[in-house]
């Protein structure tokens, strides 16, 4: 055992979905863009991602974010999202949580009005959050996400045991393959987690075979990582219940922030909802909701897109100062799949 560098983190959850916020210990190159910062992490600090996301400090479903300095005065901070397997372009449950944590822990100056605005730089684009607070209480976050759009509809594929289905490919900060489970026997519930995970990975591979993924304006965004299953809600007043399957088969416990953005674009394209029509989304656990709204139209290059906002709340779980022995293969992080 020897003295190691120390990395300070904050732990939160958003409707059950965890977040490890890594806010110290990484010497990002001065003046670097968010893409350059991610490349720097991938080349020099990917071991830190693995050590904090994986066992013994994390677990198979841990999610995290590197909270970085801004690259210019146009932003207040940068967000680089991670899990035990890879990096994500954006994360809504994470944005809700990190914005509230920044206000609660003094990482950003509070606006005297009780509504603090934070401009985040992500690898998906600009995300603007507003955090409500009153006295020593931090109440909620609402953020305007990057523009969302439907890239493809009615992608036919076969899901073993559940017959022929169709998926829509939708961008909402990440690309999602959205699949309607109504009419099948597969239900979205924690007790069906293993089956949902297995079917999500199969569906993702089938969709990847059928469509080429490429963002209209961001050349670096060309991957499908998320599959969303949805059916009727179990909470009164919700438009739907869904679960997002991603990376190595992890299940988002929350309704999903980028997922709610994609789902609103999906429903708007099919005429189910309109602009400026608030909706409520239900997640895997059936115990909490997000509020969403499409506040307008825009374009991504020549592609029509919509402007999603998502509102939710997160809870503080604790803080930690981690030391990591990179010479110990167990201490450096491992996964049991």
From Swiss-Prot:
The catalytic activity, as recorded, is:
trans-4-hydroxy-L-proline = cis-4-hydroxy-D-proline
The yes or no answer to whether the keyword Protein transport is present is no
Q: What keywords are assigned to this protein?
A: Isomerase
**Coiled-coil features, chain-numbered ranges:** none
Q: What is its EC number?
A: 5.1.1.8
Knockout: what is the outcome? Cells lacking this gene loss their ability to grow on t4LHyp as a sole carbon source.
* Highest taxon of source: Bacteria
Residues reported to bind substrate:
92-93, 252, 257-258
Q: Know the name of this protein?
A: 4-hydroxyproline 2-epimerase
Natural source organism: Cereibacter sphaeroides (strain ATCC 17023 / DSM 158 / JCM 6121 / CCUG 31486 / LMG 2827 / NBRC 12203 / NCIMB 8253 / ATH 2.4.1.)
């Amino acid at each position: 055992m020897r003295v190691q560098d120390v990395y300070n983190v904050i732990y939160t959850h958003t409707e059950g979905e965890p977040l490890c916020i890594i806010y110290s210990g990484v010497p990002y190159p001065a003046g670097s863009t968010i893409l350059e910062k991610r490349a720097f992490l991938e080349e020099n600090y990917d071991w830190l991602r693995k050590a904090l996301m994986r066992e013994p400090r994390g677990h198979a479903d841990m999610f995290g974010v590197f909270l970085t300095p801004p690259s210019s005065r146009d932003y207040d901070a940068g967000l680089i999202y991670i899990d035990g397997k890879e990096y994500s372009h954006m994360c809504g449950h994470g944005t809700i949580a990190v914005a509230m944590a920044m206000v609660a822990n003094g990482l950003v100056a509070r606006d005297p009005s009780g509504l603090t605005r934070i401009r985040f730089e992500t690898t998906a684009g600009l995300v603007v959050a507003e955090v409500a607070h009153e006295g020593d209480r931090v109440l909620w976050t609402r953020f305007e996400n990057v523009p969302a759009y439907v890239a493809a509809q009615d992608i036919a594929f076969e899901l073993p045991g559940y017959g022929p289905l169709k998926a829509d490919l939708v961008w909402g900060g990440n690309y999602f393959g959205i699949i309607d489970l109504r009419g099948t026997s597969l239900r979205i519930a924690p007790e069906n987690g293993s089956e949902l995970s297995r079917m999500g990975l199969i569906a993702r591979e089938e969709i990847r075979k059928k469509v080429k993924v490429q963002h209209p304006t961001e050349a670096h965004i060309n991957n499908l990582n998320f599959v969303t299953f949805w059916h009727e809600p179990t909470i009164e007043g919700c438009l739907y219940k869904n679960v997002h399957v991603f990376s190595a088969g992890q299940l988002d416990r929350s309704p999903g922030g980028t997922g709610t953005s994609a789902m609103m674009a999906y429903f708007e394209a099919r005429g189910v909802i309109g602009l400026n029509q608030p909706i409520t989304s239900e997640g895997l656990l059936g115990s909490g909701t997000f509020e969403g709204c499409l506040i307008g139209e825009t374009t991504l290059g020549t592609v029509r897109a919509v402007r999603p906002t998502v509102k939710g709340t997160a809870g503080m779980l604790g803080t930690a100062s981690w030391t990591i022995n990179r010479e110990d293969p167990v201490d450096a992080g491992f996964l049991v799949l």
